Amino acid sequence: MSKPDLNSLSIKMKQINLLKERFSHTIEVVKDSTFKIPFLNVHLLISLPVNFPNSPPAYFLEILQTHQPVSLPPNYQWTQISNLASVTVHIMEPFIKDSRILETLIEQVKRSQAMQQQQQQQQQQQRNQQAQQQYSPPPPYKDQPINKQPAQQQPQPVQQKPQQQQNGTNKIPMIPTEFPELKSKSVEELEELLKNEDSLNAFIYSYDEVSELSNRKSKLLSENERLTKITDPLPNDINDLSANLMTSKQKLEELKRKQEQLQQKKNSIADKYSQQNLLEILNDSISDLESESDNIVHSFLEGNLELKEFKKQFKEKRSSYHSKCANKDLFFK
């Protein structure tokens, strides 16, 4: 490297260091080439040409995913000994003194984007209308009467889905397709940018859209990890619950069998001591007592029983007989 090149490189590095000291929040997008400074809710992009400081830097305002060029102060002549930090301050001064300048520029960008969006919608509507005009109803069936004209089918209007708002929380940000700051780079600088992975990543992540996508990815990964921690124990819990369910089912079946046995025993006892059975038993007992008392009388008349024994047995049987007859009368009351 020649002495003039070394001198230019030394001046360039000194200018960059002064810029970083003056603006502590400077983001180095591409090493020693492209820088981004947060400024009034936007970003001021500084692109250094290959032959800097012999050639002036290029300034851009990063507004709504676009890069708006900013000219150097009027009547300002850039020289090799010009101070990059001071020029950057001069670039910022008009916007700081009068915030309406930046607001006007933002409104212009919004109007431009709105017009582009409107043009795209109009083109889409035209394409839809052309598709409707080209539509024709199918021919009538052959067996349809000739004198009856087929009703002309009205084409159904194509319903367009409402476009999501640009600032919708669920809308995925668009990756920028144009990189104006790369146009001022030489082939050597571009090759160096491609070879240096850190510089390339810094340049890519300097775009808010890429950063937002990266943040969304990190949030989704964190959410997946959280859900994984919740769902991983679920199979074991399900197996345990299934085992408990089977045990409870077996216990239930055993209890059902016992309940059926007890129910059968209950029905048997209920049938045995039902009113009908009790009445039949009572009638049989009354009949037996009456028959036994008659037999005692016959035995006494035939001389087989003494008077004293006859009185005792006959009285006992008749007392039981009348007692059960009384119970039978009470049963029907």
UniProtKB/Swiss-Prot annotation:
Subcellular localization, as worded in the UniProt entry: Cytoplasm; Endosome; Late endosome membrane
Instruction: State if Cytoplasm is listed as a keyword.
Output: yes
Region annotated Disordered sits at 116-176
Report the residue ranges that make up the VPS37 C-terminal domain in this protein. Answer: 256-333
UniProt signal peptide? none
Look up and give the membrane topology term.
Peripheral membrane protein
Q: GO terms for CC? A: ESCRT I complex; late endosome membrane
Q: Does the keyword Transit peptide apply?
A: no
- Gene Ontology biological process terms from the UniProt entry: protein targeting to membrane; protein targeting to vacuole; ubiquitin-dependent protein catabolic process via the multivesicular body sorting pathway
Give start-end positions of Low complexity composition bias: 116-134, 144-166
Keywords from the named record: Cytoplasm, Endosome, Membrane, Protein transport, Transport
* Family membership noted in the UniProt record: Belongs to the VPS37 family.
- What is the stated purpose of this protein? Component of the ESCRT-I complex, a regulator of vesicular trafficking process.
Q: How does this polypeptide assemble, per the annotation?
A: Component of the ESCRT-I complex (endosomal sorting complex required for transport I).
Q: What is this protein called?
A: Vacuolar protein sorting-associated protein 37
